[in-house]
A protein has these predicted regions:
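Intrinsically disordered, low-complexity acidic regions enriched in Pro/Ser/Thr
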Residues: 1-158
């Protein structure tokens, strides 16, 4: 497949896809699931002041984790899901890369995964998944980036 999407990463670590914040893109697809969960918790009697609407409740990974010389967003990801949790061999979360972390600062607390696939000319992000909510469906499709431009962004030479 040929590249069709634009990838940008700011010095802060903020990821933008096609000029939109990754967190905003994710929030849009998570909102119906998070709203349903919120409503169920309130209906079951939980105090509304203590229940958060968790859609898009992420922070970007630290720049040192995603920018070169790190290859986390390429072919040497930190396997947070596999190293921090016991997963069965057939678990769909295996082989995925953590692309967003928790706002509390502990990546393993609440994180989003994606499959990152490389060819000589492209980088594809697909199969998005919230580690702790595997029933949430992410209809983000696949993002296909030109590898050369993608790597320039990771090097901070854009």
């Amino acid at each position: 497949m040929s590249p069709r999407d634009r990838f940008a990463i700011l010095p802060s670590g903020e990821i933008r896809i096609n000029d939109r914040s990754l967190i905003d893109l994710v929030r849009e697809v998570e909102l119906p699931f998070a709203q349903e969960e919120y409503n169920e918790r309130i209906t079951s009697g939980e105090d509304p002041s203590k229940v958060d609407l968790i859609a898009g409740n992420y922070s970007y990974l630290p720049p040192k984790m995603v920018m070169f010389p790190s290859k986390h967003l390429l072919d040497e990801p930190y396997r947070i899901a596999e190293e921090g949790f016991i997963l069965k061999p057939e678990d769909s979360r295996r082989g995925k890369t953590t692309i967003l972390g928790c706002t509390c600062g502990i990546l393993e607390c609440w994180f989003l995964l994606a499959r990152i696939s490389l060819t000589e000319t492209t980088v594809t992000w697909s199969d998005f998944q919230q580690f702790h909510r595997d029933w949430w469906t992410y209809n983000l499709g696949s993002f296909i980036f030109a590898r050369q431009d993608y790597e320039l962004q990771l090097r901070g030479t854009f």
